[in-house]
Amino acid sequence: MAIHKIKIFSGRGSEYLAEKIAASFGTTLGQSEVLRFSDGEFQPCYNESIRGCTVFIIQSTFPPSDNLMELLMMIDAARRASAYKVVAVIPYFGWARQDRKDRPRVPIGAKLVANLLMAAGVDRVMTMDLHADQIQGFFDVPVDALYASGIFIPYIESLKIEDLSIAAPDIGGAKRANTYAKLLGTPIIISHKERAKANVVGKMTAIGEVEGRNILIVDDMIDTAGTICMAADMLMSRGAKSVRAAITHPVLSGPAYERINDSALEEVIVTDTIPLNPDKDLHKFTVLTIADMFADVIERVHNYKEISSIFFK
């Protein structure tokens, strides 16, 4: 079976991560640029031939709108430049919270984004910790959905935390929390929240033994940090020894940083799917890189190898 040459490129939203992925893969990023017009319109351009190559484009969709449009245009440009295959590597998949109609007259944003990526000509998508696993079914091309548990679990084990329990911040996160609890051999706690409106949480309770436990809250993303900080404070008020969090995607919008620093959270463990704001107080944050995992998956996909063995499910 012929193996086509591989080239890795980055959109402007993920250059920090793409460079690490390329280095872990043993190569350098391909040469590209984005031309910007005076009215704000932009045009990506590849500055080297990609004819007959398998092209991997690394771009998280945060902030969502410009980065998604840039990714779509890079896919289209690669297709028109006669790339053999085009793979979109989207560590953080924006719009994933819009996976269904949760009230009348609203779009299903995740499905629309999937349609746009396929219309642009993508052959395959790689991502990590989708907000809802069923989003994979929105695509008619292969989707490699990686799990950050393969990165978080070794770090958590290295801390040697006694009396550890895993907590879900809400009912929707129970499946993820149960997976971590099984892998670590710990009890599980489920927090229940009543949300008054988007990004505003009402009251919160917990199901499970809290008193005397060191608790790790696991979730796929942290946005305004209202839910997780309320959960941490509630768990401490019920007698927890300590509360940490392991969150894949640090969106951290609005007052998130300040809330975390003012909360009972002892440590917030995140990945580098989205960069932290260097101008903020980051003393509670620990960042684990996903670069090696994505580089490994890129190598396996390119060489037609299975990938399920390299991350925990």
Model-identified regions with their sequence ranges:
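PRPP-associated nucleotide enzymes
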Residues: M1-K313
